[in-house]
Amino acid sequence: GSPPATAVAAPIAANAMGMASKNGKDLRLKADESINSRLIVPHGNALPITGTFLDEISHDIPHQNWGEKEWDLDFRYMKAMGIDTVIDIRCGYRKFITYPSPYLLKKGCYMPSTDMIDMFCRLAQKYGMKFWLGLYDSGKYWDTGDMSYEVEANKYVIDEIWQRYGSKYDSFGGWYISGEISRATKGAIESFRTMGRQCKEVSGGLPTFISPWIDGKKAVDAAGGNLTKEQAVSIEQHEREWNEIFDGIHEYVDACAFQDGHIDYDELDAFFSVNKKLADKYGMQCWTNAESFDRDMPIRFLPIKFDKLRMKLEAAKRCGYDKAITFEFSHFMSPQSAYLQAGHLYDRYMEYFDMQ
C-alpha cells in the first residue's frame, strides 16, 4: 500500500527548511570556527562575573525542566567562564519548594520530585565552587509589603538547611537573604538583622548577602506593560535611605549586590560610586548583580545584548566593586539555554575576556 501521509510530509518539510540529508550527509551550513569578532574596545576591561544565581524556584521565568545531567553540564560551562560561586535564589516560593522540607511540607507546600539543594551542593563540591543558600520566600511580603512575615518560616528553614546540607557539605559556603527590597521597606532592617544573625549563628559565621534593587526609572512592575516610570529615586535619596539600612544591618549582612538593571547606562557610575562608598563606610563587600536579561525589551525576559552587559561590568570595575554575580547564567548565558541567544552571549563574553 501507499505510505502514510506523514511519512511523505516529513522529508518535504525537512527539505523546505534546508536540512534534508543527501546520502546521510547533513546539508546545513556550518560556521567557520576560525572567524573571530573584531573588537574595537579594550578586551576584558571590566569586572568578570564569578558568581551566578540558580533560578530555583522561579518567580517569573519559564522552567527549563533540566535533570541532573543538564545541571552537571551547566556547572561545567559556568566553571569554564570562571564562576566560583553559585547561589540558589530561594529554597522555596509560596507552595513550591526545592527540597523536602519537613516544616514546609507540614505547612501545605508541594513535594518536589528531586532534592535540588542536595544536587546543587554535590555539583558545587564536584566542580570546586561554593554554594550559597537562598532563604524561603512565603510570598506574604510581596502581598503585604511587610518583610517581617518572612522571619517566622525561615526560623525553621535555616535550621533544617544547616542540618541537612550545611553541616554535611564542604561546598556549603554562605547564605542569601532572599527578601528583595529597594527602599525603606516596612520591617526590612529588623528582618534582615534577625535572619542574618540566625544564619550566622547556626553555621559558625558563614557569610550572608542581600541583592536589592535600585528604584530607578526601569523599576516597573514586571507584569505591567511599561518599561519605565516617571518617579525614579534621586541619587541623594538613594544614598540617604541605604545609609540608614546599611547602618542597621551591617553586623549580620556581609555583602550587598545591588541589581544593576533598573537604572540607565549613563547613570551607572553615579549610583555605583554611592553604593561602594556606603559599603566601605560600613565594612561591607560591594558586589554587583549584573543582570544578564534585558529590561529594555517589550518581552519579559530574554538574554541581554552583550554591549549592555559589558558597559555594566566596565562600570563595576571603574567603581572598584569586589565581585560580580549575575541573574542568571542558566537561562540567559548558558550555551544549553532554551533561548538561542544566551549561548551567543556566552561566546561574546568569552571572546571579550580572551577565554576562548
Where are these regions (language model features)?
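Boundary/entry segment of secreted carbohydrate-active catalytic domains
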Residues: 24, 28-84, 89-92, 228, ...
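Substrate-binding cleft of secreted/luminal carbohydrate-active enzymes
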Residues: 86, 257-265, 284-356
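An active-site-proximal structural segment forming one wall of the substrate-binding cleft
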Residues: 111-127, 146-173, 198, 238-249, ...
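Active-site cleft segment of glycoside hydrolase catalytic domains centered on the general acid/base Glu
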Residues: 141-172, 177-205, 210-212, 222, ...
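Aromatic-lined carbohydrate-recognition surfaces of secreted/lumenal glycan-active proteins
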Residues: 131-152, 176-179, 185, 195-238, ...
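N-terminal export signals
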Residues: 1-20
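Surface-exposed, active-site-proximal loop segments in enzymatic domains
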Residues: 62, 94-112, 139-150, 300-301, ...
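Aromatic-lined substrate-binding rim segments of carbohydrate-active enzymes
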Residues: 68-139, 188-209, 270-278
